[in-house]
Amino acid sequence: MIAIVDYRAGNLTSVRRALEFLGHRCEITDDADKIRAARRVILPGVGAAGATMENLRALGLVEVLRRDVAAADKPFLGICIGIQVLLDRSEEDSAACLGVIAGHVTRYPGSIDGRPLKVPQIGWNRVRQTRAHPIFTGVPDNTHFYFVNSYFPVPDDPKVAIAESDYGVNFVAAIASGKVVATQFHLEKSGAAGLRLLDNFCRLEF
């Protein structure tokens, strides 16, 4: 079973439907024992870093995700806010995050060369694969994916980045370390390419 972590955020049902469409058995759950027992874990959703971490703490899931998922070498996928809270800290709400991957989360600038930059980024954007990773199997480089974000991850180790994009500035769009993989873009909203990445994660032999 694939556990979709329920921390009272949106988009969980969309991820479940995408997985079911692909033929994968999954469950939206906040049950720590079910998350520990799952063969893979997905942390998706939209929202603010501070509220996300508050909800995870209130549900008793912070250490479950740190110790029983990431540190236990269980395949772990973060999507959108899920990539951001994997890092140490976020400028949004000055939030202390999970610290699974060293780094921080920063906001897009309000302007570029004196011209206003519309934040959040909402829509399709080209993603460049910067490092070969099996999550991208069958997905051509420079494929467009769907983004909704005001903040983006900045890992301490540049080698953690596996994809990047541009929105006023160049930014990291996907990261991977061991069995932890995460994307800033929404797989469940990115059509066939997003479904392929989701399916790849579910089938990967790390």
Regions found by a protein language model. Give the residues of each.
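Acyltransferase
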Residues: T183-F206
